[in-house]
Amino acid sequence: MSELSAADTTLADGYGHLADRAILFHALLTAAGFHPEFVLASELPPLTGITGVAKTFPLPQDFQYPMVKVVVAGQAYYLNDTDQYSQLGATAHDGRLGLVLASRASTEIHAAKNCGNAMKTLYTLSVTDTGRTRVGVTRYYYGGGYGAKNHYFSELPPEECRRYFQETVSQVAQGARPVGGLTTKFDSYPGLEQFTVDVDNYAVVDGKYLYFDLPFTASLFPVGDDHRVLPLFISQGSQETIRTEITLPTDFHRIVIAPQSERLAAPGGTAKITSTTTADQCVITDDLETTPAIIAPADYPALLKVESALRRKSAKVFLLEKE
């Protein structure tokens, strides 16, 4: 206790360690008329095998992050593990186990509504009859991703920003040329990153056919080995949505091959692909979600199967025929 400072001391000094800042948060919220409570957060996900031990015999080394929980209009907010670049309601311990100090009861920490870690990407492809394509890329950042990108772009020097933009453009396709500059907007939520490129030979014309690939390869599990002897631990869940809106070329409207709607599932995650087509447009939406899990070696091939299905050629290629 001798290492802890009073709230007034931390406020006057302008700095303090995590516990000092938690004490200050608690004092300020109490003075403002709220009813905060101290919570010790851990890095442990709420899995059955882990939760049982942690609740029965919580170890001090597992609960080392002092946080302050306050409920406003029925919504819980956790403070003290983010910075000035983060969205209020986000927490680095989303989905982790916590310990309420006053009651010594275990709890599960959650970010506020729409403040969990997530990313949404929108690709717009306008394909011409010659194969030249304009590709627009818009990314929306939520939760911890918002805070990280806001911090990154806020501190990025102009020269480094230009280099980042050049590298980002080159990742879209070989020979991509920027149309305008990079737009970033983090003074509102979610954070936005947006740019547009032209690619002369994005699509290939071969007689009466035209073909091209989606500008990305979806991935649910970044698995490496072909087999495992020990279980695979997925400590953190993820949520990503990738939407691709394709404006078809004037003369090539007959779709011969295109990604199909399907749902792929394995222990610890699901991938849902939705494909819709109109007279002049095709829209592909990939919804990818993983959850914390301990994957037994016997279930590991199911993960490989899902990843293989997402990476196969038929999951990203379009073949159009001239009408």
Give the location of each predicted region:
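A sensor for short, sequence-defined functional sites
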Residues: 1-323
